[in-house]
Regions:
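Residue-level "edge-of-site" marker
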Residues: 39-40, 97-98, 119
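Short Asp/Glu-rich motifs
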Residues: 46, 103-104, 121, 125
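Vicinal oxygen chelate
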Residues: 16, 49, 65, 70-108
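Amphipathic alpha-helical segments
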Residues: 17-33, 80-86
């Protein structure tokens, strides 16, 4: 059965001691104001860019290095994980509803359910 997915979100992962400074830097660099998540203070958004690509900031735990990772959003997490494994990705952790994976070069990314609503509908690729 076909499913859809798209590269949707670039996340800036920052440990607590770097979070506020990094968040303010990227707000200034992009010209987008920080939009705090009203429910979870580990998350904030710097809005969306070309084709609805989102830039988010995530407060990670102590000991996590500052890094970037991308989220691939999909309407079928299992099918997308299976498709990406066939391309050489490796499952790292079942995060309960989404998967943390590594690409063949060892870069971390996540496969998540739909996060961007209408932007997903406009920009997702349909896979057989």
């Amino acid at each position: 059965m076909p499913h859809r997915s798209r590269l949707a979100i670039l996340l800036i992962d920052l440990p607590p001691h770097l979070h506020d400074r990094g968040q303010q830097f990227w707000s200034g660099a992009t010209g987008h104001p920080v939009e705090p998540d009203g429910i979870d203070d580990h998350w904030s958004s710097l809005g969306s860019f070309a084709d609805g690509f989102h830039l988010e900031v995530q407060r990670t735990g102590e000991g996590t290095p500052p890094r970037w990772h991308v989220d691939i959003e999909t309407d079928d997490v299992h099918a997308e994980v299976t498709r990406l494994e066939a391309l050489g990705a490796v499952r790292m952790a079942d995060m309960g509803g989404f998967w943390q994976m590594k690409d063949p070069a060892g870069l971390l990314f996540c496969v998540v359910g739909i996060q961007t609503g209408e932007e997903f509908e406009r920009h997702a690729t349909t896979w057989p």
